[in-house]
UniProtKB/Swiss-Prot annotation:
Gene Ontology cellular component list: extracellular region
Top-level taxonomic group: Eukaryota
Organism of origin: Aspergillus clavatus (strain ATCC 1007 / CBS 513.65 / DSM 816 / NCTC 3887 / NRRL 1 / QM 1276 / 107)
Descriptive protein name: UPF0499 protein ACLA_083080
UniProtKB keywords: Disulfide bond, Knottin, Secreted, Signal
UniProt keyword Cell membrane, yes or no: no
Subcellular location, record wording: Secreted
Family: Belongs to the UPF0499 family.
The record's note on its domains: The presence of a 'disulfide through disulfide knot' structurally defines this protein as a knottin.
Cysteines joined through disulfide linkages: C44-C58, C48-C61, C54-C68
Signal peptide span: 1-18
Length: 71
């Protein structure tokens, strides 16, 4: 009887976790996290703490406001 309870619990847990994924298990074709961070570095007005957080057309970090600005 215990084996049946454990098996039932595993089945219900599996069904609940499968139902929690609305689009099913699809692959993510988006760029990697590192690529996303590199793309965001080139945006003016992005939050920053030092010049390493900024890049592209806005390479300087305005530490008073905490955003990337043009030179």
């Amino acid at each position: 009887m215990k084996f049946l309870n454990i098996l039932t619990l595993a089945f219900i847990t599996g069904m609940a976790s499968a139902a929690a994924v609305p689009g099913g298990t699809t692959t993510n074709d988006a760029a990697s996290t590192l690529d996303n961070l590199n793309n965001k570095r080139s945006v003016c007005g992005q939050l920053c703490f030092n010049n390493k957080d900024c890049g592209g057309p806005c390479p300087k970090c305005n530490t008073k406001e905490g955003v990337c600005v043009k030179k």
